[in-house]
Amino acid sequence: MSDNHTEHSVLPAVTKVIPEQPASPATYLDSELNCPELKQRLETFQSWLADAFNGGISAETLIAARSDYIDRLLGRLWTFYGFDDVPETALVAVGGYGRGELHPLSDIDVLILSKQRLNDEHAQRVGQLITLLWDLKLEVGHSVRTLEECLLEGLADLTVATNMVESRLICGDVALFLQMQKHIFSDNFWPSPKFFHAKVVEQQERHKRYHGTSYNLEPDIKSSPGGLRDIHTLQWVARRHFGATSLSEMVDFGFLTKAERNELIESQSFLWRIRFALHLVLTRYDNRLLFDRQLSVAQLLQYQGEGNEPVERMMKDFYRMTRRVSELNNMLLQLFDEAILALDTNEKPRPLDDEFQLRGDLIDLRDENLFVDKPEAIMRMFYLMVRNQDIKGIYSTTVRRLRHARRHLKQPLCNIPEARKLFMAILRHPGAVSRALLPMHRHSVLWAYMPQWGSIVGQMQFDLFHAYTVDEHTIRVLLKLESFADESTRPRHPLCVELYPRLPQPELLLLAALFHDIAKGRGGDHSILGAHDVLEFAEQHGLNSREAQLVAWLVRCHLLMSVTAQRRDIQDPAVIQQFSAEVQSETRLRYLVSLTVADICATNENLWNSWKQSLLRELYFATEKQLRRGMQNSPDLRERVRHHRLQALALLRMDNIDEEALHHIWSRCRADYFLRHSPNQLAWHARHLLEHDSTKPLVLVSRQATRGGTEIFIWCPDRPSLFAAVVGELDRRNLSVHDAQIFTNRDGMAMDTFIVLEPDGSPLAQDRHPIIIHALQQAMTRQNYQHPRVRRLSPKLRHFSVPTETNFLPTHNERRTYLELIALDQPGLLARVGDIFADLGLSLHSARITTIGERVEDLFVLADKDRRALSIETRRELAQRLTDTLNPNDKL
């Protein structure tokens, strides 16, 4: 088995066609050293870089070529401006330019170094030189310092010190440059231990900005964890401590093995190639692989496939490579700290057993060949880590041995009986995820244990919904499940924290989470394929039939509760009965709701809000009640209507309301109105209607969050365009509608309820209530309905293709049609849908709005003008109108 798991992570081969390189700037005549001429020469050189790259020349070669070209250009200009005659002055490349790494849009950072402060004439020449470079559109960063100023600035600023560590002489006074180098590498200037620890802290802070993972779907090639900066950090540390100027020299000093050097070189080459391609696609410096750039970069790198396949293949390679860099970076920095900086430590290791020992709080091998001789010992190490809370991590040399052993595995670890016992023992232990599964994933042991895991490592989905790759998402699901055992999680997830301790076998839930997305990217239904995989895994690991079937059901149905809660009418008893029939037992319901909440939270940090929480709670308790009542006993709807009315009346009697007037209002309402509102809502509506001038429209906005959002109730004469007018106004006010209940009384008055949220998922801000009420009153009374103006899609959304789909869901209700609409999220969508309903004379009874990244998946409950389900002809016409209206086009 492979250690690196990147065998197919090699960029596509291309045929090398080497174009002729433009003339060196060293040959330019004085008469050619003017801005127009030099600009033309630079454009020619940049075009040559692109042609050479497209012709198959390596990024390494071209990066060095650009650095050399700029060296010669600056050297020629140095002479042209007379600096050869200025004593004790040097032109020094620093930063990435100092390393000789110049991508097409890279900054060119230079230091003009002098023994003494430059006089006015020489300073003026420097200004002329830099101005020319800026006029040439080169991104030049420069500093002019004396040697003393350099050292003082470097002592005060880590970034300046780092730039000086990788400085390189371009031209000028060699002795002065060497004098600076001597000071930089002395013990008085950032001693190696101090420099090392400062760079580690700097890296940790940088990683925090990217949430500690390179798996963000729009990563920064340079700065994300596992990116080029992590390789630079290793080089800086080795350069400062050993004086090593290359990865190969780091082998000579014993900092790297040859295999590790080769891995870093391969990783660096891969990242350079992607960064080089990105710079060719862009016109301004940036290192972020944003969605709108990914396809162009993938095509430039000759990734093949239909639609977004080139992007997904490129990004999978990228994520796998950054995983490798992250592991090497962490291991080597730890090794440097433990084995090099701490050479004089007298602390002796403490034996844990015959195979392992503890160095401080890190587990270490007692026999360096153990993992190769007994691969099951790898699992034994993680079992010790989950059992012994004194163990905080793995010692660096043991990580090195682990990586070596992975490379030499002859079979998956799960084929070894002892390893299987240990794996199941790990799952059954509290803290299994954070103390064992997470480090197993970081060190590719999960992949080495179960081959299925390898297919999802680095697997991305080109959308705005999934914030992480499939493997990273799965680990986050597992961590979220583990958090349900922690009482501190109760405020955010009260239901799950209440239920998790009541699960008879939490390890089965962890196993289901491990496999719930295991089949993503294979084609076919990943839930069904994953259920098949986990059944085989369960049988191999000795689970009995009941346990295996439960885990397989959880994997197969892991989306069921989320879909039912968010995209179905859960106030319809038939929906609850159908869902309950699938769940079958309260135990399975507890497992499923825990997995569902963890899955939503781990998909995207912005997805979980009080609205979703309220939907899942409502579905959970309705299902629990149905299961306890028995599947054959459906609720009596007439009794529910009667119960709601009586409870609402009891609340209103506390206010001494006019019951005759109340009867007059309620007598005009249909049964659905009482069925779909709680007694508190009914009382709230009635209280205000009784006091309201019936000649004017009424708008109510709840002060307390309702089902996680803000409830808006409207009462006014109904008209075909009312829904479109209201949702259009809410959209203009930057509010998202998540639920709508639409009722028309027997007297033609609309009594509609909308649940809305702010863009961040919170209820409507209190100070916005008066503005929204006034805006809706205006929209409700406006005689001439204004069709929503079609606004442009956001730049991010333009790069996603979501064909409009209309599905009419099966139902036994002869008076209603259930329409599921899937479309690209776009401004004014609900209002345009409402327009279509009005044009076709359709009545909307309820709407459930779900936005999933760049797509909406909405449910509408409709009837025709005779209050019956839509005919086949009307369905066909409705589907066509929706498709024609909502499919993205160039006008958006």
Curated annotation (Swiss-Prot):
Pfam families: ACT, GlnD_UR_UTase, HD, NTP_transf_2
Region (Uridylyltransferase) location: 1-351
Names of required cofactors: Mg(2+)
PROSITE patterns: ACT, HD
Cysteine pairs bridged by disulfides in the record: none
Coiled-coil residues: none
Region Uridylyl-removing, residue ranges: 352-710
Source organism, top-level taxon: Bacteria
Location of the ACT domain: 711-792, 818-892
Presence of the UniProt keyword Hydrolase in the record: yes
Keywords, in A-Z order: Hydrolase, Magnesium, Multifunctional enzyme, Nucleotidyltransferase, Repeat, Transferase
Record EC number: 2.7.7.59, 3.1.4.-
Catalytic activity, reaction form: [protein-PII]-L-tyrosine + UTP = [protein-PII]-uridylyl-L-tyrosine + diphosphate; [protein-PII]-uridylyl-L-tyrosine + H2O = [protein-PII]-L-tyrosine + UMP + H(+)
GO BP terms: regulation of nitrogen utilization
Regulation: Uridylyltransferase (UTase) activity is inhibited by glutamine, while glutamine activates uridylyl-removing (UR) activity.
Family that this chain belongs to: Belongs to the GlnD family.
The record's note on its domains: Has four distinct domains: an N-terminal nucleotidyltransferase (NT) domain responsible for UTase activity, a central HD domain that encodes UR activity, and two C-terminal ACT domains that seem to have a role in glutamine sensing.
Function: Modifies, by uridylylation and deuridylylation, the PII regulatory proteins (GlnB and homologs), in response to the nitrogen status of the cell that GlnD senses through the glutamine level. Under low glutamine levels, catalyzes the conversion of the PII proteins and UTP to PII-UMP and PPi, while under higher glutamine levels, GlnD hydrolyzes PII-UMP to PII and UMP (deuridylylation). Thus, controls uridylylation state and activity of the PII proteins, and plays an important role in the regulation of nitrogen assimilation and metabolism.
PANTHER family per record: BIFUNCTIONAL URIDYLYLTRANSFERASE/URIDYLYL-REMOVING ENZYME, BIFUNCTIONAL URIDYLYLTRANSFERASE_URIDYLYL-REMOVING ENZYME
Protein's name in the database: Bifunctional uridylyltransferase/uridylyl-removing enzyme
Protein's organism: Yersinia enterocolitica serotype O:8 / biotype 1B (strain NCTC 13174 / 8081)
